[in-house]
Amino acid sequence: MLASFVHNFVLITLESTPDVLERLLDGAADADPVWDRRPDPARFTLREIVGHLADWNGVFMERITRIRDEESPDSVARKVEDIARESGSFVAAPADSLARFRATRLAMIPILRALEPNQWERTGNIVGHPVASGAVSIESWFVQIAGHDGYHLQQIAQWLKPTFEKE
């Protein structure tokens, strides 16, 4: 179990991610071609990143609330592309995805803050993922969200470097 001060720092990190994301992307209008550049063919564009982050707030919250409310629930692993196709997030206006990310993240924070110490240790099962199958605690999902945010924020920072802006 993480120490309470660590929980608080991670909560602050999760709560501030919408501000950091918006600050990194400030000044790019929805029609700006920067949203659809793909400097690395194996990774997301900026448009896809913000849509993906908004989508996964929902995925993470569903998993966390099910683990909180049910006894060892199973969650079937889903492909990122399938979720994006269902939500339309990879083609959505970036401003809409950013607003959805902010709204869903800010809805997540009070749920996480309200968890009792014993609830953080509750687990659910991931089924059908080649790497991440098995029991996963709420606390592990909590840390995963912060890591997931950090991974994509780092990608955005790379994409926006002057060397990547040249085509």
Would you name each region that the model predicts?
Residues 1-14:
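Terminal targeting/low-complexity segments that flank the catalytic cores of oxidoreductases
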Residues 9, 33-37, 92-98:
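Short helix-to-loop capping/linker segments positioned immediately adjacent to catalytic or ligand/cofactor-binding
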Residues 11, 15, 50, 54, ...:
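Short amphipathic alpha-helical segments with heptad-repeat character
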Residues 13-17, 23-26, 83-122:
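Acidic/histidine-rich alpha-helical segments that form the ligand environment
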Residues 16-21, 25-35, 39-41:
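Long, hydrophobic N-terminal alpha-helical segment
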Residues 20-27, 59, 63, 70, ...:
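Amphipathic, soluble alpha-helical interaction motifs
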Residues 33-84, 123-167:
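Short, contiguous alpha-helical
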